[in-house]
Amino acid sequence: MKVRILTLFPEMFNGPFGTSILKKAQEKELIDIQCFNIRDFALNKHKKVDDYPFGGGAGMVMTPQPIFDCHHHVTQMLNLNEPCKTIYLSPKGSTFTQEKAMELAKEEQLIFLCGHYEGIDQRIIDELVTDEISIGDYVLTGGELPAMVIVDAITRLIPGVLSTEASYEDESFHCGLLEYPHYTRPRAFNGLEVPSVLLSGNHKDIDMWRRKQSIELTFERRPDLLKGLQLKKNEAQWVAELSKKKE
């Protein structure tokens, strides 16, 4: 996968993209990430990329010309036969989910546009942007941090990035539930014991315990995720019992 990021602050990506799984994925050439400085494409003398909004109001708005030219440069470099997704990180966008991550992970190329100040000129959105995505109901300084979050989530789903497919299939949200608790050595620590079922060696019992824990955690913390989820008869009974306890 090729990922191209249009930003005013390309240096922000060096740390997160130069460590851990993202670094290894790039070394394995499973993902190719490049950042482009929008300011480099400004044609004015002072490389100015923002201006006052028409109609008045607080803050500055990013102007069309540098972004259009930067986007054109990137699409030319990618040598695209057909348009690829251009994602604008915006609090007005649809909320990013694991389902969306799985959808984007199937793409061969992605372009991310990071806004700043009060946002970008609407004509950029109308002409270039295919998706507006938000990572939550709050406002950040720019689109750089959301871009990092989304690229990280997508990269984990690319075949070969994680050691096994099970590594991400068991994670929170992949199957619609929050992930079950994890334990490691020692068996006892400060008087706190590991659940005996995890030491039993009975994989059927372990799988059932983990599933039940996932359902209980989801019920307690994200009950909205259970709506519309297809549960087995015994799992639906667990939820019913949890509901009774809560009454």
Swiss-Prot record:
GO molecular function terms listed in the Swiss-Prot or TrEMBL record: tRNA (guanine(37)-N1)-methyltransferase activity
Main subcellular location of this protein, as a coarse class: cytoplasm
Any GO BP: tRNA N1-guanine methylation
Keyword set, alphabetical order: Cytoplasm, Methyltransferase, S-adenosyl-L-methionine, Transferase, tRNA processing
Secretion signal, residue range per the UniProt entry: none
Localization of this protein: Cytoplasm
Reactions catalysed according to its record: guanosine(37) in tRNA + S-adenosyl-L-methionine = N(1)-methylguanosine(37) in tRNA + S-adenosyl-L-homocysteine + H(+)
Protein EC: 2.1.1.228
Domain of life: Bacteria
Pfam families, per database record: tRNA_m1G_MT
UniProt function note: Specifically methylates guanosine-37 in various tRNAs.
Subunit and partners: Homodimer.
Protein name stated in the entry: tRNA (guanine-N(1)-)-methyltransferase
Organism: Alkaliphilus metalliredigens (strain QYMF)
Gene: trmD
